[in-house]
């Protein structure tokens, strides 16, 4: 998907998700960012801002009312010059979390690594928070178990759940490359 197509779809999503009492007589769609090299894999909207995580290690955001100004959160590249390939993104009231795919899996909080996991098959697919302190990230099957990490301290530290907490996991079962769409938090649970 090209960057231009993404932003046309994003604008359409923003307009279609708003509640409008009056009939719309016209619609003007304006591109926010046109870049054929961008690969956006995760989108979050909060407080009138649109955040997106890219495959080239960037988290971009813009205010819906000021879409001509796009800002970028810079991420340290400290792991053998590996550019993080972000597949998932989560927001709390004050923090932005982005998680990379592949080995090593890197979880960033506001641009700093807060969790790192190395394994030839490591691949985290999705991350979400159900409040400002508690969150979850899920990933593919490694070492005969699905991958789930949890935070209870606002994302400062993350703990991988032991396989014994899961029952009846089938061989190679997991969450699999759904680009940040395989967790849904309902009513703070």
Predicted feature residues:
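Asp-box/BNR beta-propeller loop motif
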Residues: 23-38, 56-80, 103-121, 148-168
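Signature of short aromatic-glycine-proline-rich micro-motifs recurring in repeat-based ectodomains
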Residues: 40, 86, 175-182
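Repeated scaffold domains used in trafficking and secretory/extracellular systems
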Residues: 40-42, 83-89, 122-128
């Amino acid at each position: 998907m090209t960057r231009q197509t993404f932003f046309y779809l994003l604008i359409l999503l923003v307009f279609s998700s708003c509640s409008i009492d009056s009939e719309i007589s016209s619609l003007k769609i304006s591109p926010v960012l046109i870049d054929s090299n961008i690969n956006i894999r995760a989108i979050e909207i909060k407080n009138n801002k649109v955040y997106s995580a890219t495959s080239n290690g960037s988290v971009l955001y813009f205010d819906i009312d000021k879409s001509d100004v796009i800002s970028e959160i810079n991420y340290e590249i400290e792991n053998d010059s590996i550019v993080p390939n972000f597949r998932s993104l989560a927001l709390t009231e004050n923090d932005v979390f982005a998680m990379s795919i592949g080995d090593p899996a890197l979880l960033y909080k506001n641009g700093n690594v807060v969790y790192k996991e190395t394994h030839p098959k490591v691949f985290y697919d999705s991350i979400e928070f159900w409040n400002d302190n508690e969150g979850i990230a899920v990933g593919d099957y490694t070492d005969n178990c699905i991958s789930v990490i949890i935070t209870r301290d606002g994302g400062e530290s993350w703990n991988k759940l032991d396989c014994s907490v899961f029952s009846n996991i089938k061989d190679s079962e997991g969450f699999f490359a759904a680009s940040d769409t395989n967790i849904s938090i309902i009513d703070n649970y």
